[in-house]
Design a protein with these regions (language model features):
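Extracellular beta-strand ligand-recognition surfaces/modules
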Residues: 313-317, 329-332, 378-424, 430
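Short carbohydrate-recognition loop motifs
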Residues: 243-296
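Extracellular ligand-binding interfaces
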Residues: 291, 295, 308-310, 314-392
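Beta-strand/beta-sandwich contexts
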Residues: 22-70, 117-160, 195, 204-229
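C-terminal motif of bacterial Sec signal peptides marking the signal peptidase cleavage site
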Residues: 16-20
Length: 436
């Protein structure tokens, strides 16, 4: 009996094995098969509409209409290979996404390649880059004739559609533009340029900058009152000891008076730096005073806080770092009336780890040393990045709307320890403005 059962078991396994082997010979009528012959493209439309097109932006999905499209095994837009999904290919339709990389060499054609690369069919089609993204400018307060760089993406300078950069009142001569790939372009501020947004026009269309040239919105400190900001701070170190007028230093002013932190060698750590006289300024408010009250009570600042919230705002200022900066960070500390006022004077907030602050220390990302090569630059820090303790580690606190009544800058401590240095850091036109 056992022998019979063994034979039955063996026979069952054999049948299973034979059945498995024979599945290779089964015919699946719905399986995708590459067709022979040559594809024919009659038209192209968007994947989700009946609009017929002759061009599309990178990463858009399009639908090729024609005959024998299952013969296509490769599809290229210019010199960029597209990804084919056979689930979206029939004899008469082919859905495909335009590659997200801009071609190195434009031919304005689609190439449809058949099995074994036997044949290549060409079809006229233009790939457009997205609209230019005009993100930032090296110096928003540059003078006419001064060289600046704008940063962003998709600054595609095509011979058939050259880039046009426009300031209010003046365009940049194309011959003055120097491109570094498609992410930045350098030029001189043209004669006649007026304050306002900068626009960049490419073959894809026109985009407006996220910044403003000579941005005078909500300037909190301009150090001479010429832009509606405070001409001096308020507190034990109100800025008078670091206040400068044009001609005070061997480098040029950018917009009248400014402040400059200098004259002190700073070493690593918290205890080897503290010099409020030479390396800081305070603004401690006098609540209710129409001239010396809370910063956040200034009408323009109050409106921006209401409209954009903390997450939609950034602090900006112009800076010139004239000597190598290799150590400590610039602490940017907004304070509330509970932290400090003119009546309740104290500097304890500098070391208070529960007060979240921003820290600017560009020498860290620059490889250990930073200067601006004698030029002014624009510094931008989102208020959402005011989330650090004095040593740069993450704070348990976050910046809130009621924490914007006072402001202090102090060159002290920071996230990293570098080498001793005697930095010279000039600052002007401190402002809080929308991010975009």
């Amino acid at each position: 009996m056992k022998l019979i059962l063994k034979h039955i078991a063996f026979l069952g396994l054999a049948l299973v094995f034979l059945a498995a082997c024979n599945t290779d010979k089964l015919d699946y009528p719905d399986a995708y098969k590459v067709a022979d012959g040559i594809p024919v493209v009659k038209s192209i439309r968007y994947a989700n509409t009946d609009t017929y097109i002759t061009q599309a932006y990178m990463n858009e999905t399009v639908c090729l209409l024609g005959d024998n499209l299952r013969s296509v095994t490769q599809l290229w837009f210019n010199d960029q290979k597209a990804t084919l999904n056979t689930s979206y290919i029939t004899d008469n339709t082919l859905l495909v996404s335009v590659p997200k990389n801009y071609p190195k060499k434009r031919t304005d054609k689609i190439y449809l390649i058949t099995k074994n690369e036997a044949d290549t069919v060409k079809y006229d089609f233009v790939v457009l880059p997205p609209l230019p993204n005009v993100a930032s400018m090296s110096n928003e307060w540059a003078a006419v004739g001064e060289e600046v760089t704008i940063y962003g993406d998709y600054f595609i300078d095509d011979t058939s559609s050259p880039v046009v950069i426009s300031f209010p009142g003046a365009d940049v001569p194309h011959a003055d533009m120097t491109f570094d790939g498609s992410s930045s372009v350098t030029f001189k501020v043209p004669a006649g340029a007026l304050p306002g947004y900068v626009s960049v026009k490419t073959m894809s269309g026109t985009s407006r900058s996220k910044f403003m040239y000579k941005d005078s919105r909500n300037i909190l400190f301009d150090w001479d009152g010429s832009r509606g900001g405070h001409a001096i701070g308020q507190g034990w170190r109100n800025g008078s000891k670091v206040h400068r007028t044009p001609g005070s230093d061997p480098f040029p002013a950018i917009d009248g008076n400014y402040i400059c932190f200098q004259g002190k060698e700073v070493g690593p750590g918290a205890s080897d730096v503290w010099d409020e006289d030479n390396l800081s300024f305070n603004y401690w408010p006098t609540p209710g005073d129409p001239l010396k009250g809370e910063l956040s009570s200034r009408p323009e600042f109050a409106r921006l806080i209401e409209d954009y919230g903390i997450g939609g705002l950034q602090i900006k200022f112009e800076a010139l770092v004239n000597t190598p900066w290799t150590n400590v960070g610039l602490q940017l500390v907004f304070t509330s009336n509970a932290d400090v006022t003119m009546a309740a004077a104290t500097n304890a907030y500098f070391g208070n780890v529960s007060i979240a602050r921003g820290i600017w220390e560009p020498w860290v990302s620059a490889g250990g040393s930073f200067d601006t090569a004698g030029k002014w630059i624009t510094v931008s820090i989102p208020l959402s990045d005011f989330n650090k303790k004095p040593n740069g580690t993450a704070s348990e606190s976050t910046l809130k709307a009621d924490s914007l009544t006072g402001l202090s800058f102090f060159l002290w401590y920071g996230t990293s320890s570098g080498t001793k240095c005697t930095p010279t850091i000039a600052i002007d036109n401190i402002r809080v403005v929308p991010i975009g």
